[in-house]
């Protein structure tokens, strides 16, 4: 049988496909081959047509995007003609305006707006004064101290790039260091830049800023006698920034074992100028009359942390005792008329707790509380104490005694001042970790009744507070059900459920616990975490 398909031709692009007469070929096999080739060519042509269609539609769609970019650039240029309040308002309402600007566009935009300031008539007059850049920084970023305030201006991971633009522009304007000691405005700018870079864990950049704007950190006598500058020196070169410390044992797990992460912040190396340099600085501050004027509680707090970094806990104790006891004969540190605050006392707790001597640190902190009836920022002290109790909590009766003493002293201090104990999430979270680890139903009930009850008076509860509250309640419910006190668990839910949704979750938890009848230790799933679907920490 002979079949002639010669008139049939198909094209795929530039390649011609034809089926020539086949002689003595079975008809079914030939028809199958023809069918497959026909559909293959048809599909290829459909793909080509779709590609041409997409290309045709892509050209006109790019034009509005180009127009939008031109309009955005025009908007950036027009901002320079607005008064400072308008520039601030536009930048807050439309942060994207500042994201893609280069250094010159971003910075000149605000400098042009500063010309409308009645106190600075011209830009040249503004830049001729060293404090001009401080004014510029205040206008650019009104709340500039923590670098997290920069994150709404830039895209993700772009904060450091913006800081480098700011610093590069600053060096262009004030390239030459002034003769003699830096002015207060220049020191203010140097400390701001150095702390910005430290907040981004860029220690090398921060140290470069300090060396270029302040001076050689090893030449202590030539450094300016300025409190904030000495604090920056302690944090950059003498170990006072404790978030950069390498922690040999960060947290206590079940059974008392320690979890040991590598360190608490991602930095290459947090090296120091050495203990001798720190002690020379300490002698200057304690004995030189010209240096005594820079002393402050914040400076002493950083000195305490720097001493702890160099394992000089004896000097930490002596430095702290200057506030509440006569001078120690061994070290000869004079007493001080300064009033400590909660952050300073918290630094003492951090210094000892980091070296796994939490009990000694708490004992010193309680001496401060006995000596001073009122401490400024005392709430910060309690946050630090309970955070370290959760991280360094000893097992057994010793850990329970430390927690009970701290809990009692905190409530007593606020009661003596006629104030209710204020709720704080970090304290509640740390306390729950402690009492849950101790499997103490009494302490969990006290945490819920005495500390977390103000949440019921709030019109809206934050999600993290609600989750922590649900965890505490689920822990109590689980303990009651394991003791086969299902009715008591149901009564507890009726009394303490925050809302109808929480009540239904807890009732489901009762049913699940009652059906399992497990006597195993509580875990995250057993405490009701599976009901919320979100981790607590």
Curated annotation (Swiss-Prot):
GO biological process terms, semicolon-separated: regulation of translation
Tagged with keyword RNA-binding: yes
UniProt-annotated location(s): Mitochondrion
Keyword tags: Mitochondrion, RNA-binding, Transit peptide, Translation regulation
Gene Ontology molecular function: RNA binding
Extent of the signal sequence: none
Main location: mitochondrion
Cellular component, GO annotation: mitochondrion
Key word Transit peptide present: yes
Family, similarity comment: Belongs to the AEP2 family.
Function: Required for translation of the mitochondrial OLI1 transcript coding for the mitochondrial ATP synthase subunit 9.
Complex formation: Binds to the 5'UTR of the OLI1 mRNA.
Protein name as catalogued: ATPase expression protein 2, mitochondrial
Gene source species: Eremothecium gossypii (strain ATCC 10895 / CBS 109.51 / FGSC 9923 / NRRL Y-1056)
